[in-house]
C-alpha cells in the first residue's frame, strides 16, 4: 500500500534511504569525498526534513506495517521531478518499484504535469533499462567534477 508521509514518518523513511541506497553506494564506489552523502546512502535527517518542509511530496510503500519503499517527487511548471524511488534490497523484484513509478505517473497527471524528469547514475545499466522499459528516454548527460559517475538525464512524456 502506498500512502503519503508525514513528518513523523521521516525516521522510517531515512532507514529506507540508508539501506536502499547502500547497495548503489557500494556498487559504484560512492564515498563522502567523491559524492555528497554517498549518493543519499548516508543522507542526514536534517536534509530529509528540509526536503519535506520545502514541499517535496513524499510517499511510502508499506508491506504490512513496514515501510519498504519510498517515492519523492516535486511539481514545477507542468513537469514532475522524480527525486527518488527506493525499495529496500530484500523487497526488490516484487513490483514495488513499478507500483511507486505508476503512482508517480498518476499523481503527476493529476497535478497537470506533461512530463516526468529524473537524473540517475548512467552506469547503472539495470536501472536505466528499467526506466526505459517504463517509458523513459535519455535526454542528456551531466558530469560533475570529482564524481565517479555520469548522470543520465531521462524523461517520460505523460
Question: What spans do the regions from the language model cover?
Answer:
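A short beta-loop-alpha structural element at the N-terminal edge
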Residues: 1-16, 22-27
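A conserved beta-turn-beta hairpin within the catalytic core of GNAT-like acetyltransferases
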Residues: 74-83, 92, 113-114, 146-150
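A short helix-loop-beta-strand connector motif used in the catalytic cores of GNAT acetyltransferases and
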Residues: 42-60, 81
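Conserved GNAT-fold acetyl-CoA-binding loop/helix
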Residues: 18-47
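Conserved acyl-CoA
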Residues: 99-115
